[in-house]
Curated annotation (Swiss-Prot):
Species of origin: Schizosaccharomyces pombe (strain 972 / ATCC 24843)
Gene: bem46
GO cellular component: endoplasmic reticulum; membrane
MF (Gene Ontology): palmitoyl-(protein) hydrolase activity
Annotated TM spans: 15-32
The family this protein is said to belong to: Belongs to the serine esterase family.
Keyword vocabulary terms for this entry: Membrane, Transmembrane, Transmembrane helix
Protein name per its UniProtKB record: Protein bem46
Amino acid sequence: MAGSLSSAIFNVLKYSGMASLAVTLIALGFLYKYQKTLVYPSAFPQGSRENVPTPKEFNMEYERIELRTRDKVTLDSYLMLQSESPESRPTLLYFHANAGNMGHRLPIARVFYSALNMNVFIISYRGYGKSTGSPSEAGLKIDSQTALEYLMEHPICSKTKIVVYGQSIGGAVAIALTAKNQDRISALILENTFTSIKDMIPTVFPYGGSIISRFCTEIWSSQDEIRKIKKLPVLFLSGEKDEIVPPPQMVLLFGLCGSAKKKFHSFPKCTHNDTCLGDGYFQVIADFLAENDINTPAS
């Protein structure tokens, strides 16, 4: 009888193990197929693909521009130029955080525009807001390059100093773009961004993260790209209570950055999404721009 019981238990464990393996494989298959939806939740919050606030709602004059990428995607974007002598002011190229669209970031853009007197150019990535296409790492890299090239060909912005600003996944976009275009960019500002998508997986999936990471096709290897940035000033802004991107990843990126003009500032009380509300946030940025002579006209 004992032998029969042992055999029964063995069979239960065997089939339980097989069931667990099957569930794991199904989960991995789901993640592999839908990981772009998980990495780029462009439809969240509800209505984000249809409803895009405009700068006029925030008392900013603007031009809406549709950019065409080399792979035939149309990007929705806003350009806000200073009303007086815009050619003498720096231009902010803004890459927003995940979810939502560029319109949701206009309250932040307004501070850069009104308080720091910067021209501001912001895009909705492909698959976000009213931009066409579907988001991917390769696609967002094309989008960012398209945006920079537009500024470099613009009759006013081409005469200004370009400051690239990226939040969260926008930081990864900003790092990749800057690493390739250091002679065209005057400064880089990063907020709460990560070392790589693979490094983020254990935070999102604490169990089985090492296995799941092997199936990850969206890489965003910022820890490799940041090493290449040596020619321009870089400002790192980190919320110490960030619950999405572990703050040590920002510290690591700072350490790996090859620039001699890098600066790190942390905000002890801030989480992932409210760091820009931290005490002195925009003053830190203003001081950084002044220290690196960014507020003067481009030569």
